[in-house]
Amino acid sequence: MTQTRSLIAALAATTALAAPAMAQDDTLTVGVLLTLSGPGAVLGEMARDGFLLAAEEIGEMGGMETRIIVVDDEQKPDVAANKARELVERNGADIVVGPIFSNIAGAIVQPVTQGGGILISPNAGPSNLAGADCKPAFFATSYQNDQMHEVMGAHAQAQGFQNVFLLAPNYQAGQDALAGFKKSYTGGVAGEIFTQMGQLDYSAELAQIAAMQPDAVFAFMPGGMGVNLVRQYRQAGLEGIPFLSAFTVDEATLPAQAEAALGFFAGSNWAPDLDTPENAAFVAAYEAKYGHVPGVYAMQGYDAARLIDGALREAGGTDRDALIAALEGAPFTSVRGDFSFGPNHFPIQDFYLTTVVQREDGKFATSIVEKIFDDYQDNYAANCQMN
């Protein structure tokens, strides 16, 4: 077992921060700061597992002795900010990988980047960090949040839907989701409801949908909200109305949704059956190690580790300016295939319409139906003045 793998095994098992690090030019320290407890834990666990899988395959990232410290942000901005600060200032983290949620990204970006570290998000992609608040030391291996919703709006537009019912929880991400959908959908809106955060009973909303009989429904209902909505949608006999979604039916929720989600649609930058050699190898290795189908969070964590390795090798070490310059060139082969960074350090990549299928082995997964956007850059990049 390599030194890297020994350190991963020791450090990934705990959320406690390590003792102060000695500055060593030949040692890389990576902090992995993700939501690993509470309702959002399944997403953080997937991102962590994908990252650690790639790190184990790589061995020594960039040919350097590698120390990986895994920390739980508890999905609390104040906790996350303190732990990010400790990772950089106390533990000497050169790079912090995280977070899952956008409000956590807002809390940790300053402690990491002003403390001298580089922040690489394997999921969160808030509009401000893609636009006016972009930073040289912030990168995302995921997407800008609006893009998944734009995929579904474009699909609805292409299908000629004229009467779509919109559903999302009443908080900023929910409001942004429906706004993103409308950026690429110009048809009529049958109804628009913002539900309570954490709501689990959708009988009233489903009754309205049944009465209105819209051309389709678009929903953004992440986590347990999505599990319940999908089950109740099927139980209400509404499966004849196309169900379009983002962050509602994916590999994180499908084990609980199962047959109820079959045939439902989602927007994504990836699916387990994306046809690249790197993706086939990743999915096989992930399932062999963890026993379940990887989700987009796992893929983005996996790509983050491979990006770091490639940039370190190109930069020749952890010098911050050289490493940022190397990261900008995206010197790795993504499991997604084509991948580059825009001027705001967010990916330029393809986006797909996916649907839920049951594989021959009985497991549920998303599957690509068609490509919606090719080499798509987010709408906020033009507002980024990197400084």
Where are these regions (language model features)?
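Extracytoplasmic "Venus flytrap"
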Residues: L28-G50, I58, V71-D78, I100-N103, ...
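Extracellular/periplasmic Venus flytrap/periplasmic-binding protein
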Residues: N82, S127-A130, K135-A236, W270-A281
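Venus flytrap/periplasmic-binding-protein-like
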Residues: D73, I120, A124-A130, M197-G198, ...
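Periplasmic-binding protein-like
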Residues: L87, N91-I100, I120-P122, F165-A168, ...
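Extracellular/periplasmic periplasmic-binding protein-like sensory domains
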Residues: V230-Y302, R313-G316, V356, T366-N387
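Sec/Tat signal peptide C-region and signal peptidase I cleavage site
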Residues: A19-A23
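Beta-alpha junction/loop-to-helix N-cap segments that form part of ligand/metal-binding clefts
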Residues: V42-D49, E57-L129, T141, T195-Y202, ...
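Segments of small-molecule ligand-sensing domains
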Residues: A288-A298, D309-S367, N379
